[in-house]
């Protein structure tokens, strides 16, 4: 019983307080791993775009700091997040790279049920999450695409203490991004991409606790077919890098995932559709589950 109640507190510490603005009990920081996949480091050419993320996450497993399922916990997590992102890549160049600006505000539904012998927590909400805005630089070379970004998550969504499934996190998070896509062959039919993000979390306004910082790596290997279809394997690694304050646990949360992705381009309406499935494994001090993602991108 004592271990089970401690596990519930651990779940909240890593999966809710440090939950993302696109909360689905998946992320260690604001950023949700698995948002990007194939050619995730490649930004588009100058123009206006709307990119609509749809994420479904479910989990029935809570792992210990050793990466093992904690016995006695009956966990049921489900989240759907819809996040329209407006992207403007300008014609302005800085250090040879195109300057870009983008922003998103997610809509989130989350249901959480945790049962242990002698204790139970159940909650579900739908609401608006935290605002994110950033500036980017992007380069398109003969065999490489490069990108840099600096942005910030603002606590515009509702949050509370004690913790709940409310969509807001209640803290600011600067986030820095760097990525590269390598086109292996001259025809650019094979690609390998890596996208890194680092989050510096600040004090949570309701609990006065500062979550630990987080590093996320998303990667993808893909083959282009008929110039309009990409098939590939994608994955991510997310690692909490510092303890929370005050008196944060020494057990830093982490998780990895892998799965397939397909991207389809529709040239006439200038629209792109991508679908990916990611299976999580090696989770420590957090929930471990499955992610389905449908992303629609439209150029104007």
Predicted region positions:
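Short loop/turn motifs that connect adjacent beta-strands in outer-membrane beta-barrel proteins
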Residues: 27, 40-47, 91-100, 140-146, ...
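Surface-exposed strand-loop-strand hairpins of Gram-negative outer-membrane beta-barrel proteins
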Residues: 27-28, 57-81, 115-124
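Transmembrane beta-strands of outer-membrane beta-barrel pores
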Residues: 56-60, 88, 105-111, 139, ...
């Amino acid at each position: 019983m004592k271990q089970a109640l401690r596990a519930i507190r651990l779940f909240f510490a890593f999966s809710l307080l440090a939950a993302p603005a696109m909360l689905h009990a998946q992320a260690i920081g604001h950023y949700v791993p698995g948002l990007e996949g194939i050619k995730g480091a490649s930004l588009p050419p100058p123009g206006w775009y709307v990119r609509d993320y749809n994420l479904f996450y479910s989990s029935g497993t809570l792992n210990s700091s050793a990466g093992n399922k904690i016995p006695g916990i009956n966990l049921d997590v489900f989240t759907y997040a819809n996040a329209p992102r407006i992207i403007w890549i300008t014609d302005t160049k800085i250090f040879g790279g195109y300057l870009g600006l983008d922003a998103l505000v997610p809509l989130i539904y989350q249901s959480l049920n945790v049962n242990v012998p002698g204790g139970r927590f159940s909650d579900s909400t739908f609401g608006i999450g935290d605002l994110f805005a950033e500036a980017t630089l992007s380069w398109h070379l003969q065999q490489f695409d490069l990108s840099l970004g600096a942005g910030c998550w603002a606590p515009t969504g509702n949050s509370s203490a004690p913790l709940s499934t409310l969509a807001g996190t209640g803290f600011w998070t600067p986030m820095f991004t760097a990525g590269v896509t390598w086109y292996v062959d001259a025809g650019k039919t094979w690609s390998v991409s890596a996208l890194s993000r680092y989050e510096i979390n600040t004090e949570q306004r309701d609990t006065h606790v500062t979550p630990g910082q987080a590093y996320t790596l998303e990667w993808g290997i893909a083959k282009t077919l008929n110039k309009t279809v990409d098939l590939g394997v994608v994955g991510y690694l997310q690692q909490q890098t510092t303890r929370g304050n005050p008196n944060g646990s020494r057990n830093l949360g982490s998780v990895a995932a892998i799965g397939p992705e397909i991207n389809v381009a529709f040239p006439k309406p200038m629209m792109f559709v991508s679908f990916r499935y990611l299976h999580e494994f090696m989770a420590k001090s957090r929930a471990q589950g499955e992610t389905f993602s449908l992303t629609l991108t439209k150029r104007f």
